């Protein structure tokens, strides 16, 4: 089973070297383990993690770990150390060990060795296995015993194991807490050992009583042992315990603030700041106004920049959370807590122009967050302070190429975007500052500033036109060197120009960009700019850039990919000539566009490979082609009202048949077909959306907009022609209320609202079908097509990669060979799966659970046709399982009462953290042959044999009568 399932996984993985199946790979490593040379044994051991990565199913992992346990049992300490490292690296695979008892038994045998180093390695090994053996009493006993050892190495290993078991087992934590307390407080325990024992207390959070006793002990330690190291370790453990147990977080914040204020030691203050930052990130809602005020006072009083920087970083974290609302809320006893007069604002204003960049950045961030979150009208002075602070920081950091300056600049630019979004009336001055500084800044800073300008222009398109002049001037004078920064700057500037040019690029802008790109030998830069042009709907520019790249690629797959992009851009460019009320021209434009789309889809199919099938791209383009054809067909149908109007007796026919639509003539049937076609397209767009689990939100929104376009037209057909009386506009009326994140979405929303208004107006005024109704439909199509299609990121680039590999057992040796099952028994089908990720797992969404659907269908019958209940003829089951460490397994009991060959299909889909179901696949099929059980077969044969003499006797009697 494992070898079959993992072979397909390797075929998909695309490794360059020659691959073996799971059993062969394990046998190769087993040879190394049995070698007499220590070097070969070690090499075999350290290659196991890669084996687990390639074949992540339990049957192989179980065998491999048992072999490693044998090596651990009989090998020397160096081999044991190698096995320990492999176990720690393969932590996520430990729960796939099936024979845990046997595995632990082989490991545990070494604990009785006379060698303290061997015992120490065994203890560390047991600690690494704590997640799968949390309640093993013999392991608990060995750890307690080893804590009393006279060998330092063994004691340190016991401390490591105790920490791991305390995190996993409540019983162990309760039992070890008193012993650790005695050891820490004992005079005979060395100080360095006490420092290693104290962090174990952070895991004593399994219940309130245990957490309380651990807190009391830590409180005693902080008071009784005032040395710097002890205070630092105790306070940090205190913080981690509070963060885990949650109930004592406010007390811990007060304690840390007390040490920050009163303890003169810098190291303790730094630790307090670090822990306050941790609590600010994890539990900002537990911070009271008094806590923030105390931190502000400390920051105002401290003369040390390093400490002030730390405190401001805590405050800047809090200023972006609910804590800032608490701070400025109306307090009993005060009329109001004005932002302008608070210590927090004074501190931020004081730090905005500090000579330390980090302090200035955090000061500006605090001011920005206060300005955006406090929706009061009299904040003009605060807004000006925030803007001036950002401007000074921008000037300071844009002239410096150092990594620190770039990190500070990112903070400032993020604040600018936030300020422009939260306070739109400040956006103009922010943009002017950026454009002014863009000319004199370093290239690295220019790139970041371009990203900032693009983000602001996406949010506030009205500012785009004002940017273009400065941007084009800069593009003309930009350097032409082939350095990475210059290439990146060309792409960033071009992106801002595309965003700022809301509808179409001017001829001058195109000429400037092309002129600069001609001198750039880097084809990758040209491709990236073309990609951005496709994303922003500048298809004429994109077509020319793709055309220029066709001769610069070596691979035929890349050639076909670029050629397909060129054809798609050309196809979309054909639609820019559409004009309202000119329907014959619209038909010719759509026909021309379809011609190039068909060429493009042929190239795109040629560009796909087994490792990169381009499934999303192909489906997206096929849907676009079908949508254009549906639009064309609908325009022809509307035109047919002129060429083939309803006959004079149409009204009489309609009254006779009782179908009011018949008075419209044959156009009614054609419209009904069109409506069904658009609904079918909307359903297919929905399927594409559900299959795109790894797509970014902008791409998904784009697919959603295409789906809404189909639904809009189908609704318009129904409301205008097919069923005007029952048409409802309420469910469609809210489309414009959602916030649009891109110019494409904004324009599409505008078209939707306009079309809905027109349809509703006609629906109320006129009865169908008139030329005004068909003209409204045609104008709606033209309005939708006049918005240039946006090819979003996922069409070009896959930032997140998630796939599921399934293994079924039992499974046949040959995939085409069926599994034999008796018809009076049930088949226990075990389904195992592994979730595989790319380099950025969970970037856009994470898998919460996997939904497994198992169904069976009868392929061919054999034997007699018995009357069997319908319930026994098919199997249809579904289960949801939550992956743990990217692994899941479950079982299904299937019934095959009908003799014959059955086809079992297992299909997986996933559910993300928001509860949305995604049809990711895969779909796996096996065959089962249902055979008659021997006992039933024997009885049937006996009955047949008993019937044969009776039949012969009847036959003889018949002959006698004759």
Swiss-Prot record:
GO terms of biological process kind: cellular response to ionizing radiation; DNA damage checkpoint signaling; regulation of transcription elongation by RNA polymerase II; RNA polymerase II transcription initiation surveillance; snRNA 3'-end processing; snRNA processing
Localization, UniProt: Nucleus; Chromosome; Cytoplasm
Phosphoserine: residues carrying this PTM: 338, 809
Pfam families: INTS7_C, INTS7_HB, INTS7_N
GO cellular component, one term: INTAC complex
Record keywords: Chromosome, Cytoplasm, DNA damage, Nucleus, Phosphoprotein
Phosphoprotein found in the keyword field: yes
InterPro entries found in the cross-reference section: ARM-type_fold (IPR016024), INTS7 (IPR033060), INTS7_C (IPR054519), INTS7_HB (IPR056517), INTS7_N (IPR056516)
Family recorded in the similarity comment: Belongs to the Integrator subunit 7 family.
Function, in words: Component of the integrator complex, a multiprotein complex that terminates RNA polymerase II (Pol II) transcription in the promoter-proximal region of genes.
Subunit structure: Component of the Integrator complex, composed of core subunits INTS1, INTS2, INTS3, INTS4, INTS5, INTS6, INTS7, INTS8, INTS9/RC74, INTS10, INTS11/CPSF3L, INTS12, INTS13, INTS14 and INTS15. The core complex associates with protein phosphatase 2A subunits PPP2CA and PPP2R1A, to form the Integrator-PP2A (INTAC) complex. Interacts with NABP2.
Designated name of the protein: Integrator complex subunit 7
Organism the protein comes from: Homo sapiens
């Amino acid at each position: 089973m494992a070898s079959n399932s993992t072979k397909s996984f390797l075929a998909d993985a695309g490794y360059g070297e020659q691959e073996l199946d799971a059993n062969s790979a394990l046998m190769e490593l087993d040879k190394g383990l049995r070698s007499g040379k220590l070097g070969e044994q070690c090499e075999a051991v350290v290659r196991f993690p890669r084996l687990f990565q390639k074949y992540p199913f339990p049957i192989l992992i179980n065998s491999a770990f048992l072999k490693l346990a044998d090596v651990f049992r009989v090998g020397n300490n160096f081999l044991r150390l190698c096995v320990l490292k492999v176990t720690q690296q393969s932590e996520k695979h430990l729960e796939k060990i099936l024979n845990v008892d046997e595995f632990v038994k082989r490991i545990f045998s070494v604990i009785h060795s006379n060698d303290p180093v061997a015992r120490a390695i065994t203890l560390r090994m047991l600690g690494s296995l704590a997640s799968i053996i949390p309640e093993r009493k013999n392991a608990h006993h060995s750890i307690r015993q080893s804590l009393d050892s006279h060998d330092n190495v063994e004691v340190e290993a016991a401390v490591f194991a105790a920490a791991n078991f305390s995190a996993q087992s409540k019983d162990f934590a309760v039992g070890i807490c008193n012993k650790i307390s005695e050891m820490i407080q004992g005079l005979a325990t060395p100080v360095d050992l006490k420092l290693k024992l104290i962090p174990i207390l952070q895991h004593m959070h399994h219940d309130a009583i245990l957490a309380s006793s651990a807190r009391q002990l830590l409180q005693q330690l902080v008071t009784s042992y005032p040395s710097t190291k002890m205070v630092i370790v105790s306070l940090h453990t205190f913080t981690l315990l509070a963060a885990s147990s949650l109930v004592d977080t406010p007390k811990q914040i007060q304690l840390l603030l007390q040490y920050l204020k009163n303890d003169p030691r810098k190291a303790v203050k730094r630790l307090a700041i670090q822990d306050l930052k941790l609590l600010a990130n994890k539990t900002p809602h537990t911070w009271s106004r008094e806590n923030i005020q105390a931190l502000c006072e400390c920051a105002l009083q401290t003369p040390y920049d390093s400490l002030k920087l730390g405190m401001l970083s805590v405050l800047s974290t809090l200023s972006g959370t609910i804590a800032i609302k608490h701070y400025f809320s109306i307090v009993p006893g005060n009329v109001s807590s004005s932002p302008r007069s608070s210590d927090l604002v004074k501190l931020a204003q004081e730090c905005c122009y500090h000579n330390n960049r980090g302090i200035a950045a955090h000061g500006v961030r605090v001011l920005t967050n206060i300005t955006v979150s406090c929706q009061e009208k009299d904040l003009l002075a605060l807004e000006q302070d925030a803007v001036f602070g950002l401007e000074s920081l921008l000037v300071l950091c844009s002239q410096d190429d150092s990594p620190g300056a770039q990190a500070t600049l990112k903070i400032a630019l993020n604040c600018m975007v936030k300020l422009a979004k939260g306070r739109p009336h400040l956006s103009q001055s922010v943009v002017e500052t950026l454009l002014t500084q863009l000319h004199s800044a370093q290239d690295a800073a220019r790139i970041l500033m371009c990203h900032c300008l693009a983000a602001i222009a996406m949010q506030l398109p009205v500012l785009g036109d004002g940017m273009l002049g400065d941007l084009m001037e800069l593009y003309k004078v930009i350097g032409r060197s082939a350095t990475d920064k210059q290439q990146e700057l060309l792409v960033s500037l071009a992106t801002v120009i595309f965003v700022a040019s809301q509808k179409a690029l001017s001829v001058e802008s195109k000429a400037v960009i092309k002129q600069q790109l001609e001198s750039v030998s880097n084809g990758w830069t040209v491709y990236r700019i073309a990609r951005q042009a496709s994303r922003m709907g500048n298809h004429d520019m994109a077509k020319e850039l793709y055309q220029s790249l066709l001769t610069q690629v070596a691979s035929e797959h890349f050639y076909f990919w670029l050629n397909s992009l060129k054809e798609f851009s050309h196809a979309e460019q054909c639609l820019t000539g559409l004009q309202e009320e000119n329907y014959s021209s619209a038909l010719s434009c759509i026909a021309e566009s379809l011609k190039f789309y068909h060429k493009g889809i042929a190239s795109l199919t040629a560009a796909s490979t087994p490792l990169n099938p381009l499934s999303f791209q192909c489906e997206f383009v096929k849907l676009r082609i079908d949508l254009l054809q549906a639009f064309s067909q609908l325009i022809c149908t509307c035109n047919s009202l002129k060429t083939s109007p309803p006959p004079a007796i149409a009204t009489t026919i309609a009254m006779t048949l009782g179908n009011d639509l018949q008075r419209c003539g044959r156009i009614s049937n054609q419209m009904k077909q069109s409506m069904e076609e658009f609904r079918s397209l909307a359903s297919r767009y929905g399927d594409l959306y559900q299959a795109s689990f790894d797509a970014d939100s902008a791409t998904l929104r784009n697919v959603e907009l295409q789906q809404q376009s189909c639904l809009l037209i189908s609704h318009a057909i129904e409301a205008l022609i097919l069923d005007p009386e029952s048409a409802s506009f309420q469910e469609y009326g809210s489309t414009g209320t959602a916030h649009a994140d891109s110019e494409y979405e904004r324009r599409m929303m505008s078209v939707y609202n306009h079309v809905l208004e027109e349809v509703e107006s006609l629906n109320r005024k006129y009865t169908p079908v008139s030329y005004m109704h068909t003209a409204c439909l045609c104008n709606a199509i033209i309005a939708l097509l006049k918005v240039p299609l946006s090819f979003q990121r996922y069409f070009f680039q896959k930032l997140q990669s998630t796939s599921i590999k399934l293994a079924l057992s039992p499974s046949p040796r040959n995939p085409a060979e069926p599994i034999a099952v008796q018809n009076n028994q049930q088949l226990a089908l075990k389904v195992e799966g592994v979730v595989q990720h790319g380099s950025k797992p969970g970037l856009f969404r994470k898998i919460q659970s996997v939904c497994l659907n198992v169904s069976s269908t009868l392929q061919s019958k054999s034997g007699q046709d018995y009357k069997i209940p319908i319930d026994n003829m098919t199997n249809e089951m579904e289960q949801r399982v939550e992956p743990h460490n990217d692994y899941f397994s479950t079982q299904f009991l299937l019934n095959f009462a009908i003799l014959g060959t059955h086809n079992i299909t297992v299909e997986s889909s996933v559910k993300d953290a928001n509860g949305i179901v995604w049809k990711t696949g895969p779909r796996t099929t096996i065959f089962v042959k249902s055979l008659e059980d021997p006992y039933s077969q024997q009885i049937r044969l006996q009955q047949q044999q008993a019937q044969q003499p009776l039949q012969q006797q009847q036959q003889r009697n018949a002959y006698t009568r004759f």
